[in-house]
Structures are given as C-alpha cells and as structure tokens.
Amino acid sequence: MARDFPLERVRNIGIAAHIDAGKTTTTERILFYSGVVHKIGEVHDGAAVTDWMDQERERGITITAAAISTSWQDHRINIIDTPGHVDFTIEVERSMRVLDGVIAVFCAVGGVQPQSETVWRQADRYSVPRMVFVNKMDRTGADFLKVNKQIKDRLKANALPIQLPIGAEGDLTGIIDLVANKAYLYKNDLGTDIEEAPIPSEMEEEAAEWRNKLMESVAENDEELIEIFLETGELSTEQLKKGIREGVLKHGLVPVLCGSAFKNKGVQLVLDAVVDYLPAPVDVKPIQGVLPSGKEDVRPSDDNAPFSALAFKVMSDPYGKLTFVRMYSGVLSKGSYVMNSTKDAKERISRLVILKADEREEVDELRAGDLGAVLGLKNTTTGDTLCNTDDPIVLETLFIPEPVISVAVEPKTKGDMEKLSKALTALSEEDPTFRVSTDPETNQTVIAGMGELHLEILVDRMLREFKVEANIGAPQVSYRETIRSSSKGEGKYARQTGGKGQYGHVIIEMEPAEVGKGFEFVNKIVGGAVPKEYIGPASNGMKETCESGVLAGYPLIDVKVTLVDGSFHDVDSSEMAFKIAGSMAFKDGVKKCNPVLLEPMMKVEVESPDDFLGSVIGDLSSRRGQVEGQSVDDGLSKVQAKVPLAEMFGYATQLRSMTQGRGIFSMEFANYEEVPRNVAEAIISKNQGNS
C-alpha cells in the first residue's frame, strides 16, 4: 500500500502548556478548520473531542494525551493534546518522547506559569523544536509582548514574534503577519471569513520595527541571508520562511504567534506555521538504540529501513487493550509477528488503527513517521520497543518520575477484592507513574502516584470503568532512604540440615550512586570466586532488599554496589543461597554507610494580592519552606518556594482563609532531599512503633 503523504509532508506535533492556557480549545479549532469535526466542541460544555474520558469532560482538564490525525495544505498532521496539570506529567513526558515538534500554548494574561517551565524543560530534555501560540488575546489584561518577554527571561528562549495582534481584549479584530507583511481581518464569529488587507496605518511603524527585528534575528543564523540583508536591508517572504524554519530546526529560535482559539481568531495561521516551520520526521535526528551486541545504532526515518517503533502509551477500553506506537522506521502490517525487544517476547499485530480522539479508522499498515495504535499486544507496556525479529534493537526509552504520594485502598465489600486487583493491574499497565504494592506489615494494598488529583481520578476510574467501590486511606508521603558514605558488606549463608546443604558467600563494596540511578550493580569478580550463574541471583537479592530500607522501611535509592569477592561450594551452592547471601551482604553494608531519610520537595508558586505577601511567606516558612523568589506586579504578588510535600497537605484550605479566598497556588515535584534530623527521628520512631 502506497503512502498517503510523503514523509517530508508529515508533522508529528504536540500541543502543550499549563492548565487553562486553552490547549484543548486550540486543538478543537484545529480539528474544526481542518475538517475532522464539523461542529465546534467547547471544553466548558464538556463536548471537546480530545477530552474523551468522563472525568475529563466533567473537570474540563485533559488527563491523557489523545492522539489525532488530520491534514492541512496537503500535509498529514498527527496531534497529541497533552494535560497541563502537574499530576499528569508522565502524559506530557511520554508525548514529548515521540514528537517531532511542539506548539506551546500560553495565556496572554497569565503568561509563563510554573507548569509552563516544566513542559519547556521536558521539551528541552528530548530536544523538541517548538513554536509558541499566545492564546486568549480576547481576555481583559491580555498583553502579547509582555508574554513574549517572559518567555525570553524565564524560559531563556530566543522568542521571536512573527505576528502582532490588531487590537486586544474585546477589540481583537485581526492579526498582522510580519513574515508576509500583511494583515488578516476576521469578518465573522466562526473565523471562516478572513480578509487579507494591508497593515492598518496606525500600526505600520510598529509592524515595520518588529519585522526589522525578525529579519535581523533570522539573518544572524544564516550566512547567505545575512549577506542579502546587509546589501538590500530586506528579506523576501520566502527567504524569511526558510530562515525561520532553519532556526527552529537548529533550536536557535522560537516563532511566537497570537490569537484567540475561543473567539476563532488566528488558528488557521497556527496550522500554516506548523507546515512552514515545524520539522518532518526526516528533519530530526534518527532515533538511537542499542543492538543485542551492546553496540549503539540509529534507525533512519525511512519505509525501507528495518521496522522499529516505540510503545508510548497503553490504554484499556471496551474493545480491548490499545497500545499507542510511534513508528520510527520501516512498515508495520496487520497480522504480522514482531519482537518486543525490551522484554524479549514475540507479539502478534491483530489490528492497526489511526485515532481521531474516540473514533478510530482501521488501517492495514503503519509506516515510518506515523502515530497509531495496535490492538492485540499481550506483553507490551509503556516505553517498550517493537522491532523485526531479524533486526532487533532497543530504542531509547522514557524518563519515568518517581511517585510522591501514596494511599491505602481496600474494596468496600470483601467480594470486590478480585475486581479491585484486576482494576489496579489494568490501571498500572496504562500509567507507569501509578504503582501498586502490598504493605508487608498490614497486608494493605497501597497505591502511589504523582499527586492527590492523580490518585483521585484513578479511584474514580475504578468505580466508573471497573465498577469497584473503594475506601481510601489518608494520603501518605513517599519517603525514600539513601546512603551518604562508602563501606564493605559481607553475607554468608550456610545451612546444613542433613543431605544437600545451602551455601552462598559474597563480599561487596557499597557507595552512593549518582542521583536518579536507583540501584546500580557492578560485577568485579575475577578468577571465578563466584560462578557466573550465581551473580544474577546475588544481585537480585540485593535489589529486593532495596525495596525496604534499614531506617524506616522505605525504598533505598541511588546506591551503587560492586561485587568484589565471595566463595562457593561445589555441591551445596544454589541460586537461592546466593540470593539470600546477597541480601545479607547488602543489609550488613548499608548500616555502615550512614543511611539517611529523604523526602519529596515540591516547587510551589503562590499568587495572591500583595497585601497578603507577608502572611504567605510566613506560612511557607513555618512549613519548612525555602523561599526562592518573589515579585509584585500590578498589585499581585508571586512567591516561589521549595516546600516538603509532608507540610503541604491541607494547604489549599489554609491559603483560602489566609487570603480571603483570593490566593491560588500550583505545586510540582522538584527533587528528593534529606529530612532534617529532628523530623527524621519522629518519622523513624513512628514507623518502628507501627512495625
């Protein structure tokens, strides 16, 4: 089957931003103008196409990254609409991993918010080229150039306006296109009747000034264009487009557009810019991976290359399990067998679909550069690589943040225990930041996630989709343990009970690992002191012991263990004996390595009228918060602080009463830090008292 669109005319883009910047409305308008939907759906009416879960339609926020295909100007555009709420960071993270370009949406009033910074960092992590759409230009207080300056200052981006609004707030009547040097005036409410016109005389001077800045910035990055610009003082529309595109692909500049998705102004120009400036799959670096030999390799974006794809999302729905994939190379056909190289398992492709939110179109194949979904995969989860059985490769996977909050959960009726277990398994398959475990002491089922809203929505889904009513305990902080110094550890397990005995013996060196490494194991056994077949079990014994630290039973992270020596017995040694010896050595070593307790620290931003600034700062300090920045603008104060999550429960209520209901705050995970000694002692004694 031939391609519908050549690879050069494919765009895989994400629409990302902070909450309430208008991402989903922007996506809806894109679908309307490109002909996918014939009626505009509003988020606040609960009718948005991309918000297809019941909870999304009720809450007016996007929870899961919905993938949709559309076309514009003879280009295929695959769009992922991502959530702006920090509890759903993994959805943004996994979509960034598979995208080629991003439209970052900012509110013309709110500007750069803490969540905008998080999304920007995620795009930086995966080197995703981007453009900006400053939305809500119809709102009171809208200021396009102020937001442009914030993007430059706070996100350190070379933000370059390629448009100017004509009017603002209630008088937004059109948009000046600085590249084409003309104006577009909107003549009807639906935004379908657009008049191309000269730039209004009262804005000619301002437009000329900004066009000159645009030409200078674009020329700076291109030797050929700088010569033309220095000679003639002018660049043509085509030269500007070429220069902007090259600047975007090299991460040298970020074009900034404006409009109001809700008022149907500026969205078609955003689509034009996607086609003109954002990369096709062939414009970005080929995906890297590792061959079975351990050698690094790349897969070019080409239908004729060996097949490779990354599973970036798993979802259960009434028709079965849907696995979303980004095709990097080759062709994937319905009915074929492929290899999951991450898990070394064979999978059969029963059906392939392209999604239009909750509608699906069945296809016979997916090709390099496509975003689609597979039905029928049994073993594949988020972050796994699918490839040809003859040409195996494991692609770079996703960064998955640690959960920061946990609650105990139990079914309201004993008979629902099995249903609860099935529901939790299905939900954790879909969402790698949602973890399920059993407390060994209380035997309670514990669920952990990225925040209270995250867990609340998952519990809600258990009721709606799996018909399980559950009782939820009070939220608990997910503490961690780590070590601060190095030491040796030894574990010898010897049992003789008549007949065949048990013998395993290992000596290890322990030291702190780099932050984020988790458990790192290095084998330095020489001369066969520990046979090869027992090294894996010894490592597994240590890794399992990591799950429960020595201070208060919390998981131990960022520990490097080097296996240096040991001994074995020809008859009595076994995998189990070495697993136990590994665990004993680990426990012995960790006690001597100055273990400490860690707690999740949250990046908090509080916005309130400046009369309450003193109270807000005082309250944050009383919560062990470190104030990192503050500003006052137009009578509104903003405070940035780092506060332990343990101190933030109930903060929303306290802030409301402290600011007479006029304060708002946002919170996101920053990092794990050591708990002060007096606080740690209380946590440790409480946990030891419970055990």
From Swiss-Prot:
GO terms for cellular component: cytoplasm. GO terms for biological process: ribosome disassembly. GO terms for molecular function: GTP binding; GTPase activity; translation elongation factor activity. Pfam families: EFG_C, EFG_III, EFG_IV, GTP_EFTU, GTP_EFTU_D2. GTP binds at residues 17-24, 81-85, 135-138. It is found in: Cytoplasm. The keyword Protein transport does not apply. Its main location: cytoplasm. Residues 8-282 form the tr-type G domain. This is Elongation factor G. Signal peptide: none annotated. Catalyzes the GTP-dependent ribosomal translocation step during translation elongation. During this step, the ribosome changes from the pre-translocational (PRE) to the post-translocational (POST) state as the newly formed A-site-bound peptidyl-tRNA and P-site-bound deacylated tRNA move to the P and E sites, respectively. Catalyzes the coordinated movement of the two tRNA molecules, the mRNA and conformational changes in the ribosome. Transmembrane segments: none annotated. Belongs to the TRAFAC class translation factor GTPase superfamily. Classic translation factor GTPase family. EF-G/EF-2 subfamily. The keyword Cytoplasm applies. Keywords: Cytoplasm, Elongation factor, GTP-binding, Nucleotide-binding, Protein biosynthesis. SMART domains: EFG_C (SM00838), EFG_IV (SM00889).
